[in-house]
Amino acid sequence: MRRIVLTGVPPFEVQDLAGPLEVFSQCDYEIELVSPERDGSTAINRGLRVTGGTDFRKFDRPIDTLWVVGGPEAPSGSYDPAYLRWLKEMSSQARRVGASCLGTFVLAASGALEGRRAVTHWQWCDHLAERYPRVELVRSSIFVKDDHIYTSAGITTGIDLALLFVEED
């Protein structure tokens, strides 16, 4: 069974997590939430929390697909350095990686997108290009594949990308 790991920097957008989660949950996948928070919970916007996840420091299982989400704080670039190291390592080990909308910022901050093509939400393209000049920004696509790393331009295109992953499997 393929292991799908969903992760990101809180608070993330509900639909950024729920859309791909719903797609993946319809398939024969083992789905896990890995959190940058020690208790394994993750804040999502609107004051809600998702519980039942695993602290990234305790997660050491193989990952087939790593899915990275973001939210309103993602462009700030203020992330736990240990989490970013973990994310970069897992990105290099996973068969494939997906980032939806502002999750591209989180993946870029880890260094996993250096020298790669990527896309993010159109409102944030200039900010991504300025903050991460070693990422080749593609402004005209809804999603971009560079080797085993895929990025999508928005929340609903993240659902499209999740459907593409299912089709590939």
What does each model-found stretch correspond to?
Residues 1-97, 105-109, 139, 167:
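Extended, subdomain-level signal for the structured scaffold at the beginning of enzyme domains
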Residues 8, 120, 153:
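Small/polar loops that bind or transfer phosphate-bearing groups
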Residues 46-50, 133, 152-153:
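Short, surface-exposed amphipathic charged segments that create phosphate/polyanion-binding patches used
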Residues 92-97, 112-117, 148:
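Short active-site oxyanion
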Residues 105-113, 144, 159-160:
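Acidic/polar active-site rim loop that often engages polyanionic ligands
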Residues 113-142:
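A conserved active-site-flanking secondary-structure segment within enzyme catalytic domains
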Residues 141-169:
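Conserved anion/nucleotide-ligand pocket segment
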